Amino acid sequence: MIEHRCNCKMGVHRAPLEKYIIRKGAIESLPEVLGEYSRVYMVCDDNTYEALGKRAEELLLQVGKFSHKCILHGDVLPNSESIGNVLIHLNDPKAEADIFRYSPKPDFILAVGSGVINDVCRLVSYRLGIPYGICGSAPSMDGYASAGSPTLFDGTKATIKCTTPQYIIADTEVMSRAPYEMLLAGIGDMFGKYTGILDWELARDYNNEYFCETIAAEVIAAADLCLENGYELEARSCKCIENIMQGFMVTGLGMAFTGNSRPASGSEHIIAHSWELDCVERGEKPNLHGLEVSEATLLVAYMYRLLYAETEDMHLKTLIEKYLPYFDSVEKFCRQMKLPLPVTRPDEMLAGIRRAVHLRDRYTILFYLRDQRALERYAEYAVAKLCERL
């Protein structure tokens, strides 16, 4: 367990994460890390099995700790189909059944992948009371250490509170070989911390919500670290990947420490989730989450800039002002590194903002503008500004 003493009203922040290893060749430490377990159930997809799962299986077989595996095929989503497949394969389906006993369970679930695989295994782990860990395949999102699983169910996407992994293994050499768009997506996910933390401060001051200065400052510093190192992504430097993953650990633990996703997401994530739901409803494969977050971050930043220019509330103006340099840095990075904008139609951008305000009961700039009867005008302004870049 990781403990973090703090001056906020919580006093002590705790997360059940035992250990994380971020370095070149980290996968080789897997047998030692899982020393206390003997029946490891591995979950991966077709791509992550080839990238990392095959080696993980070899290492665990060598020390007699491997039980069996579940490989999820096709475009894997964090939905009932994926969760059901992981549950069905929890015990080797080929194993002989004993009608006088319940199905034997593995003593550890090893997720091999990034966002979706981690989310599915986290939820199964929590529901069944089986500890789990993750071997990360790409620095594509910041939720490795978080305690929530974004899940598609009942026609929406919601984050279900679960637990953190016990162990996180991030082999930077393996991660550096991930598709370039996934590397950009990880950076894009971190850009949302600037608007997300500002939304959190807005909720503290205008909705009387709990706020932790220490965690917020650590998350901003982690986002800065990722932004500074992001320019080296094209070179696929292991050191660059290591720094980015260290930033991810801070934001993931921030979510676990506070018991909610405030330290890592705000209006930009809700807009991104709205776009993702639109894709699912159309029967299309969702875009990379982090790229949608970076695009939504630009939209939210435009709304905050306009609010800064128009508001007569001096406290609000001062609050927004300290984030303006961050917004400028994000926009510069997106332009210079040519981050893809996955949603390009103005009507789809607007529809995402309109839907987002109803998607989650979380106080953000969207709620503030709605209460001021100004959301539609600000949304149209932000979309027009972003479309100037297309």
PLM features per residue range, with description:
Residues 79-87, 91-105, 253, 257-261, ...:
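Non-transmembrane, aqueous-exposed alpha-helical and coiled segments at domain scale
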Residues 1-108:
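ATP/NTP phosphate-donor binding region
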Residues 214-228, 232-235, 371-390:
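Long, charge-rich alpha-helical interaction segments
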Residues 216-329:
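Active-site segments that bind and position negatively charged phosphate/pyrophosphate groups
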Residues 128-224:
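A glycine/threonine-rich phosphate-anchoring loop and its flanking beta-alpha core
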Residues 24, 37-49, 182-186, 350-360:
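N-terminal low-complexity or amphipathic/hydrophobic leaders
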Residues 1-2, 6-7, 306-390:
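C-terminal charged capping/lid subdomain of soluble metabolic enzymes
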